[in-house]
Amino acid sequence: MSLGRLCRLLKPALLCGALAAPGLAGTMCASRDDWRCARSMHEFSAKDIDGHMVNLDKYRGFVCIVTNVASQUGKTEVNYTQLVDLHARYAECGLRILAFPCNQFGKQEPGSNEEIKEFAAGYNVKFDMFSKICVNGDDAHPLWKWMKIQPKGKGILGNAIKWNFTKFLIDKNGCVVKRYGPMEEPLVIEKDLPHYF
């Protein structure tokens, strides 16, 4: 039996907290089909820019900024520059940045993962880059589906991601604490960081 099918069968019990083993529900529910019953970002996994699967539980205890990125957007330079700056200044305090390339907005991230990695290296990116994904629609990555429906992850005029460089601030427990629109530059997040370190 597949993990997805098992989670669908057990969903009523999981939602009611009937399983005694803590973490079991989350481990099983962060799949492509059953992301709704996840309780934190730490229950998901994603492929890094080199194609290796990463369990996002590795970010437990860290404050994270999760953002969709694009190489050919008018906001690319300011966002990459400021994200690199934030990472350089706050990584030792426990900040982690997770960048997810996405080609859904104006086809502004057309390159391969290798090309995207090379582009990011031009900005001296030291934060974590992931493989290209969709952030909206049926094919959206489960993490992004989940973040958009969290009480503090909802957007203005609907929950869909509106453009490149939408950012989510995630606390040490893996919960969404704030969403920033694409027009908000990364340094805007700096004022909120001290509340979560």
From Swiss-Prot:
Residue(s) carrying Phosphoserine: S40
UniProt family annotation: Belongs to the glutathione peroxidase family.
Entries under InterPro entries matching the protein: Glutathione_peroxidase, GPX_AS, GPX_CS, Thioredoxin-like_sf
Entries under PANTHER family matching the protein: GLUTATHIONE PEROXIDASE (PTHR11592), PHOSPHOLIPID HYDROPEROXIDE GLUTATHIONE PEROXIDASE (PTHR11592:SF134)
Membrane spanning residue stretches: none
Disorder: Spondylometaphyseal dysplasia, Sedaghatian type: A form of spondylometaphyseal dysplasia, a group of short stature disorders distinguished by abnormalities in the vertebrae and the metaphyses of the tubular bones. SMDS is a neonatal lethal form characterized by severe metaphyseal chondrodysplasia with mild limb shortening, platyspondyly, cardiac conduction defects, and central nervous system abnormalities.
Subunit structure: Monomer. Has a tendency to form higher mass oligomers. Interacts with FUNDC1; this interaction promotes GPX4 recruitment into mitochondria through TOM/TIM complex where it is degraded by mitophagy.
Active site per database record: U73
Xref: Pfam families: GSHPx
Catalyzed reaction equations: a hydroperoxy polyunsaturated fatty acid + 2 glutathione = a hydroxy polyunsaturated fatty acid + glutathione disulfide + H2O; 2 glutathione + H2O2 = glutathione disulfide + 2 H2O; tert-butyl hydroperoxide + 2 glutathione = tert-butanol + glutathione disulfide + H2O; cumene hydroperoxide + 2 glutathione = 2-phenylpropan-2-ol + glutathione disulfide + H2O
Organism from which the protein derives: Homo sapiens (Human)
GO MF terms, alphabetically ordered: glutathione peroxidase activity; identical protein binding; phospholipid-hydroperoxide glutathione peroxidase activity; selenium binding
GO cellular component: cytosol; extracellular exosome; mitochondrion; nuclear envelope; nucleus; protein-containing complex
Protein name listed in UniProt: Phospholipid hydroperoxide glutathione peroxidase GPX4
